[in-house]
């Protein structure tokens, strides 16, 4: 009998609709009683376009695709935890840092004392994960105070900087779950995985 355990994926971003100013600024020195200041606004700025006039480092750049839910499992004959492979894809015009900042258990969970769970992150050959393995559960207990950078994803064109070389695939990473438990009784567990995204200026 398989043990099927589910996770919800909670992605945290700062999203706002706003009038966004030009990302370049200059000062003028006034020696008189008046001044004229140019006002340049963008309505509906496209955060997938690298040339959009969104200030550098602004989280309005963030446009990332993640799964809404994930699963892991094992069987009575094999203690090793397995899972499908899931994708994180950066669709935006700027690179994005991806971090795991929360992992919480459902109040009804009764996890076995020998249960361990890890998050395994994989980038590409030219953009390896910052943290390849993150411990989520150890001896049945959830890891608290998580703040682990997993990877920096290139922008949708595969570029890390404005003058950098575009490398196909560097805007995406994959993740799976690992771990183990020797329990022979089917046990349903539910958790929430919290991811946080940060726009990277160039």
Feature-to-residue mapping (PLM):
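Hydrophobic transmembrane signal anchors and adjacent membrane-proximal interface regions, especially
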Residues: 33-41, 117-119, 146-148
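Short beta-strand segments enriched in hydrophobic/aromatic residues
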Residues: 102-104, 179, 199
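A surface/secretory-pathway sequence property marking extracellular, secreted
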Residues: 103-146
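Short, polar/proline-rich extracytoplasmic segments that appear immediately after membrane translocation
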Residues: 20-87, 92, 183-202
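Short, hydrophobic/aromatic beta-strand segments
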Residues: 95-102
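Exposed beta-sheet edge/beta-hairpin loop segments within beta-rich domains
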Residues: 76-80, 138-192, 202
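Surface-exposed charge patches in extracellular/virion surface proteins
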Residues: 61, 94, 120, 133-135, ...
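Sec-dependent N-terminal signal peptides of Gram-positive bacterial secreted proteins and lipoproteins
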Residues: 1-25
């Amino acid at each position: 009998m398989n043990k099927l355990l589910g996770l919800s994926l909670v992605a945290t971003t700062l999203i706002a609709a706003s009038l966004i100013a030009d990302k370049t600024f200059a000062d003028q020195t006034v020696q008189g009683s008046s001044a004229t200041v140019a006002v340049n606004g963008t309505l509906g700025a496209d955060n997938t376009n690298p040339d959009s006039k969104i200030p550098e480092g602004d989280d309005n750049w963030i446009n990332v695709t993640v799964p809404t839910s994930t699963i892991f499992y094992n069987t009575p004959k094999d203690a090793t935890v397995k899972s499908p492979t899931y994708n994180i894809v950066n669709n935006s015009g700027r690179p994005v840092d991806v971090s795991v900042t929360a992992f919480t258990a459902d109040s009804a969970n009764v996890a076995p004392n020998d249960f361990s769970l890890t998050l395994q992150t994989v980038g590409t050959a030219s953009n390896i994960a910052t943290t390849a393995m993150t411990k989520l559960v150890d001896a049945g207990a959830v890891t608290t105070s998580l703040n682990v950078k997993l990877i920096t994803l290139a922008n949708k064109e595969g570029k890390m900087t404005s003058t950098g070389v575009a490398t196909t695939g560097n805007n995406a990473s994959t993740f799976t779950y690992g771990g183990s438990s020797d329990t022979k009784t089917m046990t349903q567990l539910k958790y929430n995985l919290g991811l946080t995204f940060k726009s990277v200026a160039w």
